[in-house]
């Protein structure tokens, strides 16, 4: 019962946040400089008649009150109608569908690559605590966090194009962007896996398994892997959301036709409907992904369910991730 209530609460919270994002996107359009009528007509106001201007305003609903305009905006949004681009005259929804796949592909590929690299390295760092491999992994993680993604991207692009003289579209528009975004994300996951595993290695469950004569591989797979990975799920939700924002810089650096590239191009041309669409896409994606991550954590983590079922024990059953910083 408590789980159902918690799921409903998170879903309602998601709807409220999406509503706020939609309203902010509407306000952004109204506060933006310039007149959309001028942009649509592609003419100076002095060169068009008053009838043309008024007809365009009526078509856009600009003569209505702000409240009525907001109501029409929300109604159109529910029907996936974001208007048309000032530049190409195409529906904004269709433009987003054309540009979104590459952004989503890069983001999810970055997530997979980061997990495949960081979980094994985090386990190695914890199992070889304070040894050379642990120190090397920690130094690399610190450098990855310290360096901005665009700086890493510039270095990789220089190495591949100038020093190695490799000219490949797949390399420059997929492999390098994924590698650039993965380095920073790997650092956080490695530190979290290492910290959680160091705590678990001292737990009674591990000690009991060793007393029963179980080998280290069995202990790692059956006793340590699940509780080590569970705290990563909320971090993945946050990281995947931030990856979408990070692609704004990376896509422009590597000239990738994704949402980030579209957003910057629309800002330059003051194509406000497309800007609205990009902001809504990024905002909706971040909120939905974080909600899914919260629900997965709730369903998979028994400690979360125990706390929901007995709120009085909330302070007595801390999550691993809450004390992980002391062992970092």
Curated annotation (Swiss-Prot):
GO CC annotation terms, alphabetical: plasma membrane
Keywords carried by this UniProt record: Cell membrane, Ion transport, Membrane, Nickel, Nickel transport, Transmembrane, Transmembrane helix, Transport
Disulfide-bond pairs as recorded: none
MF terms in GO: nickel cation transmembrane transporter activity
Entry membrane topology: Multi-pass membrane protein
Protein's cellular compartments: Cell membrane
Pfam family, any one: BPD_transp_1_N
Alphabetical list of InterPro entries matching this protein: BPD_transp_1_N, MetI-like, MetI-like_sf, Opp2B
Domain ABC transmembrane type-1: from-to ranges: 100-297
Main location group: membrane
Alphabetized PROSITE patterns for the sequence: ABC_TM1
Record keyword Oxidoreductase present: no
Transmembrane segments: 11-31, 104-124, 139-159, 170-190, 229-249, 279-299
Subunit details: The complex is composed of two ATP-binding proteins (NikD and NikE), two transmembrane proteins (NikB and NikC) and a solute-binding protein (NikA).
Similarity remark: Belongs to the binding-protein-dependent transport system permease family. OppBC subfamily.
Family annotation (PANTHER family): DIPEPTIDE TRANSPORT SYSTEM PERMEASE PROTEIN DPPB-RELATED
NCBIfam families membership: Opp2B
Function of the protein: Part of the ABC transporter complex NikABCDE (Opp2) involved in nickel import. Probably responsible for the translocation of the substrate across the membrane.
Full protein name: Nickel import system permease protein NikB
Organism: Staphylococcus aureus (strain MRSA252)
Gene field: nikB
């Amino acid at each position: 019962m408590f789980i159902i209530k918690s799921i409903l609460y998170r879903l309602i919270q998601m709807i409220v946040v999406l509503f706020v994002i939609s309203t902010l996107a509407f306000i952004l359009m109204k506060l933006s400089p310039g007149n959309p009528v001028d942009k649509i007509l592609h003419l100076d106001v002095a060169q068009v008649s008053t009838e043309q201007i008024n007809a365009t305003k009526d078509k856009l609903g600009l003569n209505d009150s702000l409240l009525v305009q907001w109501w029409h905006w929300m109604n159109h949004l529910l029907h996936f109608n974001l208007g048309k681009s000032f530049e190409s005259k195409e529906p904004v929804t269709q433009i987003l569908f054309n540009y979104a796949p590459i952004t989503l592909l890069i983001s999810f590929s970055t997530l997979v690559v980061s997990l495949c690299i960081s979980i094994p390295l985090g386990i190695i760092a914890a199992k070889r605590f304070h040894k050379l491999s642990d120190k090397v992994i920690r130094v690399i993680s610190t450098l990855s966090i310290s360096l901005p993604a665009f700086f890493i991207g510039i270095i990789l692009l220089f190495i591949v194009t100038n020093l190695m003289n490799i000219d490949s579209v797949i390399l420059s528009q997929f492999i390098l962007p994924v590698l650039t975004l993965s380095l920073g994300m790997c650092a956080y996951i490695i530190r979290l896996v290492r910290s959680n595993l160091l705590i678990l290695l001292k737990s009674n469950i591990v000690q009991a398994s060793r007393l029963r004569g179980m080998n280290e591989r069995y202990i790692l797979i059956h006793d340590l892997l699940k509780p080590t990975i569970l705290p990563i799920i909320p971090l993945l939700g946050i990281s995947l959301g931030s990856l979408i924002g990070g692609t704004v810089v990376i896509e422009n650096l590597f000239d990738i036709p994704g949402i980030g590239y579209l957003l910057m191009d629309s800002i330059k041309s003051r194509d406000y409907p497309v800007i609205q669409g990009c902001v809504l896409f990024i905002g909706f994606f971040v909120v939905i992904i974080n909600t899914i991550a919260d629900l997965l954590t709730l369903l998979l983590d028994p400690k979360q369910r125990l706390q929901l079922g007995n709120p009085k024990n909330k302070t007595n059953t801390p999550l691993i991730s809450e004390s992980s910083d002391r062992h970092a």
